[in-house]
Structure formats: C-alpha cells, structure tokens
Amino acid sequence: MICGVGIDIIELNRMEALIERNERFIERILTENEQRKFQRLSANRKVEYIAGRFAAKEAFAKAVGTGIGKVSFKDIEIINNDYGAPNMKVKGYNDNVIHLSISHSKTYAVANVVLETRE
C-alpha cells in the first residue's frame, strides 16, 4: 500500500553555487559510498550527480512527511543497480518498499519517491 509520495526539483546552477560556496556541502549530503563515486566523475557530471541525489533525498523526506530533520541526508543512500537505475536505502525504513526515479536536463534535476508498506 502506498503510504507516501514526494517530489523535488532543483536548478543545477543553484547546486553548482552551493558546492562552490561550501566545500563541506558534499560531505553533509553524500554518504561515503556516494562521495567515492562523486570523486570519479567529470566536473559537469558532478553537478548533475549531487543535484540528483539531493533532490532524491529531499523527495524521500517529503514522502515520509517529516522533511529533512527526522531523517538525515546521510541516512539515505542511493546506489545504481547493474542497469544504472537508482535504488534508495534508508536507515530505519527496511520495512518499506521505496521506488525512486531521478532525471536531469541541462538546467534541472528532479526526483520522485513513492513509499510503500510491505504487506
């Protein structure tokens, strides 16, 4: 049964400015595994990557209904499967099924999360 839906969109230039202004921003948002992948990406791809992860984590917090605070950015990890599709793992939410979609354009990153209870 669906118990939550969340969506978030962010401008890539806003994310790029956040990264440039605050060097610790990446450490606050990404888990260690996500940071390792981030470091291997090209400069252009880095902005898309962190913007997509940020939007996905915000979308999850909206689906839960608490916003970021009860769940932290580092409690949420997004790892791509063998086909490149993103999968979300969240500490304390093992009893839920989490559906995630992330998309990018030249100017935006958007993420959608559907949260289900296991029956």
From Swiss-Prot:
E.C. number: 2.7.8.7
Cell location: Cytoplasm
SUPFAM superfamilies in alphabetical order: 4'-phosphopantetheinyl transferase
NCBIfam families for this protein: acpS, pantethn_trn
Classification via Pfam families: ACPS
GO cellular component entries: cytoplasm
Catalytic reactions of this protein: apo-[ACP] + CoA = holo-[ACP] + adenosine 3',5'-bisphosphate + H(+)
Family designation: Belongs to the P-Pant transferase superfamily. AcpS family.
Molecular function GO terms recorded: holo-[acyl-carrier-protein] synthase activity; magnesium ion binding
Biological processes annotated in GO: fatty acid biosynthetic process
Species of provenance: Oceanobacillus iheyensis (strain DSM 14371 / CIP 107618 / JCM 11309 / KCTC 3954 / HTE831)
Protein known as: Holo-[acyl-carrier-protein] synthase
Stretches that traverse the bilayer: none
Cofactor(s) recorded in Swiss-Prot or TrEMBL: Mg(2+)
Residues annotated to bind Mg(2+): 8, 58
